[in-house]
């Protein structure tokens, strides 16, 4: 992971602003501890903190075209960069081996309307000194975070994390996923549009399991490009186990040269985190034994988790209960992963949104409702699991890649017949995915019930969080919460506790508005609560809130 920081529409002293930009960019150096770079002129400033994974020696940023007239700062990975280099290499003189430099080639060729050509995860800021124009863009689902804000002079700031904007901006907001801002028309435009957003476009499709299986294998393989050691996050659940199995299949050869040479680090390392004796640790070890990975089991105590909560809220920049519950073990694990010399990991985020994997999907009344909920969940994922995976890992300088959210894979998986994703009546959640990959995994894992990450690390983790919140937040505080927190008013003591910490760390009203809210059961959207009368009486995002869970709340 890297970080970017940019200032545009400059109206104040550029020399002083450059100093300020360096100071604010430094707040995100945990994302990119390997190198720092800056471009500064009277009209634009671009700062970058680099985590070097591809082209370690020559890929420092900002990147420039040959004429030094186009400047680019990027946080991301472009998985189809080799194909784009081949296509544009006769018309653009590449200066580095960085995968991200293809953005400059595309801009030179097409102007601002090229973002859908990119397959990957990214957030970037590009400055064109010839036109005195800038282009800001974010990937299709917002896998990579990006925020924007304005100061009292009307100067525009962009940054990978809001902590770099809060000290200087009057207002901030999340830069929309799947969108770009081109300064010459001044509008934020959405570029990510798919036919599968509409149920009618997919309802009569025929599901091809072979195509689905191959699409995921292709996605994982493309995500393996790396010039540094990498690993896999292996919780022992279906999604991370599938990603680990496919990664193991290709890890012995370098994908960068079409598998002509041996991988520089042929032994695949896997990582699991949990309280001692937790459900995830046992299942993860079983998968690791089956696949033959070098497995690392990372333990944490409830007290260690509690001690990390404030740091987690600072790094994840949220007060969302589910996100904080799940981010804390991930944050602790990331520190150990970095200590072992690993700089990139593959993870299983996104599968539950694509395939209707959360336990509340058992209550989906029909295929149309299920499909529409999966689309809602995917388009909102930048506020939840994408933020968690990205920021919890980058807090310690580790990059998380998410093959289930690959754009090409989504175009296959979201076009299969939604009826084939329905669960209940004897069918397990994500049964179509299980059927595709059951040969890759032990049967006990291929058909293991969905366990949310915050539950799977150990049930006592969430139970203790609730107990601590009950001790620290009074009944009166919760009853009067609407006066202190009129926006996204906390509805539980746990939520109140997190919100209190968040407001201390980010004391800007618009910062709180960057965090999602609303009722949820087992990670559902507010809309899906209408599926079951019992949901309307609950307000707990744990999977144990749904009766089909084997350890459901009584």
From Swiss-Prot:
Glutamine-dependent asparagine synthesis activity can be inhibited by aspartic acid analogs (such as a sulfinate derivative and (2S,3R)-2-amino-3-methylsuccinate) in vitro; the inhibition is competitive with respect to aspartate. Its EC number is 6.3.5.4. L-glutamine binds at residues 50-54, 75-77, 99. ATP binds at residues 233, 273, 347-348. GO terms for cellular component: cytoplasm; cytosol. Residues 2-186 form the Glutamine amidotransferase type-2 domain. It catalyses: L-aspartate + L-glutamine + ATP + H2O = L-asparagine + L-glutamate + AMP + diphosphate + H(+). Gene3D superfamilies: Glutamine Phosphoribosylpyrophosphate, subunit 1, domain 1 (3.60.20.10), HUPs (3.40.50.620). Optimum pH is 6.5-8. The keyword ATP-binding applies. InterPro entries: Asn_synth_AEB, Asn_synthase, Asn_Synthetase, AsnB_N, GATase_2_dom, Ntn_hydrolases_N, Rossmann-like_a/b/a_fold. One of its GO terms (biological process) is asparagine biosynthetic process. Pathway: Amino-acid biosynthesis; L-asparagine biosynthesis; L-asparagine from L-aspartate (L-Gln route): step 1/1. The keyword Amino-acid biosynthesis applies. Coiled coil: none annotated. The record marks 349 as: Important for beta-aspartyl-AMP intermediate formation. GO terms for molecular function: amino acid binding; asparagine synthase (glutamine-hydrolyzing) activity; aspartate-ammonia ligase activity; ATP binding; identical protein binding; protein homodimerization activity. The active site is at 2 (for gatase activity). It is an enzyme of class 6 (ligase). PANTHER family: ASPARAGINE SYNTHETASE (PTHR11772), ASPARAGINE SYNTHETASE [GLUTAMINE-HYDROLYZING] (PTHR11772:SF2). Catalyzes the ATP-dependent conversion of aspartate into asparagine, using glutamine as a source of nitrogen. Can also use ammonia as the nitrogen source in vitro, albeit with lower efficiency. As nucleotide substrates, ATP and dATP are utilized at a similar rate in both the glutamine- and ammonia-dependent reactions, whereas GTP utilization is only 15% that of ATP, and CTP, UTP, ITP and XTP are very poor or not substrates. Also exhibits glutaminase activity. Homodimer. Belongs to the asparagine synthetase family. This is Asparagine synthetase B [glutamine-hydrolyzing]. It comes from Escherichia coli (strain K12). The gene is asnB.
